[in-house]
Swiss-Prot record:
Compositional bias per record (Acidic residues), positions renumbered to this chain: 710-723
Protein name per UniProt: Voltage-gated delayed rectifier potassium channel KCNH8
Subcellular location: Membrane
Topology versus the membrane: Multi-pass membrane protein
Organism: Rattus norvegicus
Keywords: Glycoprotein, Ion channel, Ion transport, Membrane, Potassium, Potassium channel, Potassium transport, Transmembrane, Transmembrane helix, Transport, Voltage-gated channel
Lineage: Eukaryota, Metazoa, Chordata, Craniata, Vertebrata
Segments dipping into the membrane without crossing: 420-440
């Protein structure tokens, strides 16, 4: 016997419970999220609070639970701090405080803040209740003022008045304590004698069923219902039979059925007891487990009928109590139990065989009842004519045919009760199914009238039941047939696809609930044939709740009618997610009943109840709106949703209302689900004024530009050292190089000075740039006068090159190794930093109707994160490569130390004595004191000095060029590139020098010449000298200095050989300094001090 189970999913009824409890006192309360430590935002506010404070619900949502928006000038600051402290410590607070309404009117409020815990004991919500006590406060204040006036009139009684006022204050205080004590006692009593806590927990509450509560859909209850059904049929058969055929004439015959009758009465009494403990399904479809509600429901429905039907009349026969025939008539009240059968008939109608069986049973039962009536009519006719010799009744005819006629004034004899009942049942059945055969016929007027009624009922029953049983089932139970058909299809689908039990339960509950709501009627299918005018009026009536919102007050009736056609009804079960974070929003939802919660990262952002609107602020041009949170049902929720696609169509037809709708929906939404809503606001504020992007420094004369990803508008200038560290090789065009060669030295040095003062120095060698790729070198390359720079979100800028023609790029630059015999002339290219100017980024302002503001902002943030990640990976890789190189050099030095003889460690220290910058002459002079013999390099020459070394240098900080070996502080400055100007052989020949500091130690970086027969070209050598560098006391150094002939061809200069036998056995790295010269043709020279400074032994001649 299938039974509608009802809605059994566990629900979170916290909001309903709180609202129900506050209806008895005051319904002014708010709920705040206790898991967000910053501000504790409000997630729900009652209608009473909105009326009390004068704020709309949308204005209160997401504000702080401390109610700072209600504070005013007379609000006690100490109470403010206590409220904040109680929220931080998550403890209860209660006090009287003055608040201010939205219109500025003050009112005294009794504020009570209580923390709400979940099933784990964690505080997840704050419940703040507000009670207006302004009248009480005003009354007390007016009494005090009256006393003050009386005090002013008679000072003699001032002492008495003050004492009285003081005593009244004490009594008031004591009465308050007594009230609190009484409340505490009530709380204690409630906690002791009541199962419910003082405040409900915010959790999904399972149905708490007592073990003495019987489920109405359980197997035992189904079997018991079948037993009661059989007992009901027994009563329907035996009661009319006993009343009509037996009466009180034959008690011995009556006693034979007394046992079964008593058993049936006992069953009915037990059924009454079980009904008081059996669950039932409410009108809303929920299963009721509460014993009190079950008792009330049963008493007000079927209890009276069941009680009368269960009266133990047959116990009177069991105790030999003489009864009159009226008692037998009272037993017919038990036939009211058949009404319970009609109530449950829909449960038995899922199978056609059961329906047919029930119909046949009802037909036979009707024939049985009519047979009893037919016998009573014949009996009464015989008794009324007992004094006459009248023998025309059907009982007389039956007695004659059976040879048992009546005699003794028709009081004795006659057919037996058994024969009479069979004959009566035969007559009624033949009359119901046909017109009869005449062997048992009606002779008297009463019998004929009854026969006529029987024939009419028979014709109706025959036409309804036997004529077309299938049509009867289809007409009467077509809806249920469809229900069971769909249920069977659903179960088959679940069985075929092996769906899990949880998903199966959800599908069945959703189907049953939606069916109970609309009874299987598809409103769209039903209304599609109606004209649009009538269909619009019908849908407006069906959706009148959502159309009565203030959002649609300005809409015309035509607009509302068009909009009502796009409103759908939806249903959500407890625990079901209406929307997931990141889903495309398809509709705007209005909560008709139930409660829901908005979740993000398992935190409650808002609680939605009846009358709340949830969706997103719209724009006419919106295509896709992504949700920023989850929406989950706490209870069974009925929703009405406006499909966005249809909404945009309607707004397109009514443009005069569209703008108003877009503005108003932002204020009417209880919670805005638009993804990036907060970011959209920030981006609009930041894009009101477009900040032009700073022009980063480049490294060459570039006409064309490559497309780029630039930094944000707020980024600062990018230094050239950072730019060049990201590029492996920098070149310059031949035309630009030629113009620089033919220019005057003053203009060239002026340009260089301008670049130095602006913080940029162009590199004249691609190898030097590649050597600065290490993180340490990059850090040291920053000039000290620029200080620290903020971290920037870099974006890759691709610029286009613009030259007179395609430059020849040497493919040998790829690996940095060149054949020593090659003397091929190649072009070099220089990119001037003053030529690079990225186009300023123009960020279009985002208007309020701009649809892509949030999307573009998020895309920009993602791009920044990706570029930052890529930059960090490149930096990490560079550091690893640099560390690997250092490790290799350390291993080489260790091997040399092991293989070479140990020598005492000494060093050649350099001390700067003076520096005299002069921008007019573009030259300064620096003198170095060498306590020990040192090697000094000048253009086209190198000399070994035992005393002072003097060279020309300009625009260089002396602390970056040399250092005292005795100083202990570490220098964190980056590598410094400077121009050395010498003129021993070539006029205005600029040299190139780089001094790199590592703490307070120094090491040199050398660059090999571009083309040479002995030194490896295009190779950067870091000559880091340590102990036992020189393997022998006699070492000769060969330098090959290229020079420029008059014809412009490149030739090799003189080879200078210097003996280093007077040098100490080893040079300490601290005192090592060197300079590499670069003639006008940009061919650097290199200083080599020992074989340990080069990786290729063929590079020098020892």
């Amino acid at each position: 016997m299938p039974v509608m189970k009802g809605l059994l999913a566990p629900q979170n009824t916290f909001l309903d419970t709180i609202a129900t409890r506050f209806d008895g006192t005051h319904s002014n309360f708010i709920l705040a999220n206790a898991q967000v430590a910053k501000g504790f935002p409000i997630v729900y506010c009652s209608d009473g609070f909105c009326e009390l404070a004068g704020f709309a619900r949308t204005e209160v949502m997401q504000k702080s639970c401390s109610c700072k928006f209600l504070f005013g000038v007379e609000t006690n600051e100490q109470l403010m701090l206590q409220i904040e402290k109680s929220l931080e410590e998550k403890v209860e607070f209660k006090g009287e405080i003055m608040f201010y309404k939205k219109n500025g009117a003050p009112f005294w409020c009794l504020l009570d803040i209580v923390p709400i815990k979940n099933e784990k004991g964690d505080v997840v919500l704050f419940l703040a209740s507000f009670k207006d006590i302004t009248d009480t406060k005003v009354k007390i204040t007016s009494e005090d003022k009256k006393e003050d006036r009386a005090k002013g009139r008679s000072r003699a009684g001032s002492h008495f008045d003050s004492a009285r006022r003081r005593s009244r204050a004490v009594l008031y205080h004591i009465s308050g304590h007594l009230q609190r004590r009484e409340k505490n006692k009530l709380k204690i009593n409630n906690n002791v004698f009541v199962d419910k806590p003082a405040f409900p927990e915010y959790k999904v509450s399972d149905a708490k069923k007592s073990k003495f509560i019987l489920l109405h859909f359980s197997t035992f209850k189904a079997g018991w219902d079948w037993l009661i059904l059989l007992a009901t049929f027994y009563v329907a058969v035996t009661v009319p039979y006993n009343v009509c055929f037996i009466g009180n004439e034959d008690l011995s015959t009556t006693r034979s059925t007394t046992v079964s009758d008593i058993a049936v009465e006992i069953l009915f009494i037990i059924d009454i007891i079980l009904n008081f403990r059996t669950t039932y399904v409410s009108k809303s479809g929920q299963v009721i487990f509460e014993a009190r509600s079950i008792c009330i429901h049963y008493v007000t429905t079927w209890f009276i009928i069941d009680l009368i039907a269960a009266l133990p009349f047959d116990l009177l026969y069991a105790f030999n109590v003489t009864v009159v025939s009226l008692v037998h008539l009272l037993k017919t009240v038990r036939l009211l139990r058949l009404l319970r059968l009609l109530q449950k008939l829909d449960r038995y109608s899922q199978h056609s065989t059961i329906v047919l069986t029930l119909l046949m049973s009802m037909f036979a039962l009707l024939a049985h009842w009519m047979a009893c009536i037919w016998y009573v009519i014949g009996k009464m006719e015989r008794e009324d004519n007992s004094l006459l010799k009248w023998e025309v009744g059907w009982l007389h005819e039956l007695g004659k045919r059976l040879e048992s006629p009546y005699y003794g004034n028709n009081t004795l004899g006659g057919p037996s009760i058994r024969s009479a009942y069979i004959a009566a049942l035969y007559f009624t059945l033949s009359s119901l199914t046909s017109v009869g055969f005449g062997n048992v016929s009606a002779n008297t007027d009463a019998e004929k009238i009854f026969s006529i009624c029987t024939m009419l009922i028979g014709a109706l029953m025959h036409a309804l039941v036997f004529g077309n049983v299938t049509a009867i089932i289809q007409r009467m139970y077509s809806r249920w047939s469809l229900y069971h058909t769909r249920t069977k299809d659903l179960k088959d689908f679940i069985r075929v696809h092996h769906l899990p039990q949880q998903l199966k339960q959800r599908m069945l509950e959703y189907f049953q609930t939606t069916w109970s709501v609309n009874n299987g009627i598809d409103s769209n299918e039903l209304l599609k044939d109606f004209p649009d005018e009538l269909r619009s009026d019908i849908t407006m009536h069906l959706n009148k709740e959502i159309l009565q919102l203030s959002l649609f007050e300005c809409a015309s009736r035509g607009c509302l009618r068009s909009l009502s056609l796009h409103i759908k009804t939806s249903f959500c079960a407890p625990g079901e997610y209406l929307l997931r974070q990141g889903d495309a929003l398809q509709a705007i939802y209005f909560v008709c009943s139930g409660s829901m919660e908005v979740l993000k990262d398992s935190m409650v952002l808002a609680i939605l109840g009846k009358g709340d609107l949830i969706g997103a602020n719209l724009s006419i041009k919106d295509q896709v709106i992504k949700t920023n949170a989850d929406v989950k049902a706490l209870t069974y929720c009925d929703l009405q949703c406006i499909i966005l696609k249809g909404l945009f169509e309607v707004l397109g037809l009514y443009p005069e209302y569209a703008h108003k709708f877009v503005e108003d929906i932002q204020h009417d939404l209880t919670y805005n689900l638009r993804e990036g809503h907060e970011s959209d606001v920030i981006s609009r504020l930041s894009n009101k004024s477009t900040v032009p992007q700073a022009e980063p420094k480049g490294n060459g004369s570039i006409k064309k530009r490559l497309p780029s990803i630039v930094e944000d508008e707020e980024e600062e200038e990018v230094e050239e050292e950072e730019t060049t560290s990201l590029s492996p090789i920098y070149t310059r065009g031949s035309s630009v190089s030629h113009s620089k060669k033919t220019g005057s030295s003053k203009s060239y040095l002026g340009l260089s000075l301008k670049q130095l003062t602006s913080g940029t120095v162009p590199f004249h060698s691609p190898i030097r740039v590649s050597s600065a790729n290490s993180p340490k070198t990059k850090q040291e390359a920053d000039p000290p006068n620029h200080g620290t720079r903020k971290e920037k979100n870099l974006k890759v800028q691709l610029c286009s090159l613009g030259t007179a023609g395609t430059p020849e790029l040497s493919p040998r630059i790829v690996d940095g190794i060149e054949d020593g015999n090659s003397s091929e002339e190649t072009q070099t290219f220089d990119f001037g930093s003053e030529q690079i100017r990225p186009e300023p980024r123009i960020s279009p302002s985002l208007g309020e109707s701009e649809i892509g503001a949030a999307f573009l902002f998020i895309k920009a943030e993602e791009t920044k994160q990706q570029i930052n990640k890529l930059n960090s990976e490149v930096t990490t890789l560079t550091q690893e490569v640099s560390q690997l190189g250092k490790d290799m050099r350390s291993i080489m030095q260790l091997l040399e130390n092991i293989l070479s003889p140990q020598q005492p460690s000494q060093f050649c220290s350099l001390h700067p004595t003076s520096i005299c910058p002069s921008r007019e002459s573009f030259q300064t002079r620096v003198s170095w004191s060498a306590h020990q013999p040192c090697l000094h390099l000048q253009a086209n020459g190198a000399h070994l000095y035992h005393g002072n070394v003097t060279s020309d240098i300009w625009s260089v900080d002396p602390s970056l060029v040399g250092s005292n070996p005795q100083r202990t502080e570490a220098h964190e400055q980056s590598p410094v590139d400077s121009e050395l100007h010498h003129s021993p052989n070539l006029a205005y020949s600029p040299s190139h020098c780089q001094v790199i500091q590592e703490g307070h130690l120094q090491f040199l970086r050398c660059i090999s010449p571009h083309s040479d027969t002995t030194l490896t070209p295009l190779q950067s050598i870091s000559a880091t000298l340590s102990s036992s560098v020189c393997s022998s006391s006699e070492t000769s150094l060969h330098l090959v200095l290229p020079s420029r002939s008059e014809e412009g061809s490149i030739t090799h200069g003189p080879v200078s050989s210097f003996s280093l036998e007077n040098l100490p056995g080893s040079w300490d790295r601290e005192g090592m300094m060197s300079a590499s010269t670069e003639p006008l043709e940009n061919f650097p020279v290199e200083v080599v001090t020992s074989t340990a400074d080069v990786k290729d032994s063929k590079a020098i001649n020892v």
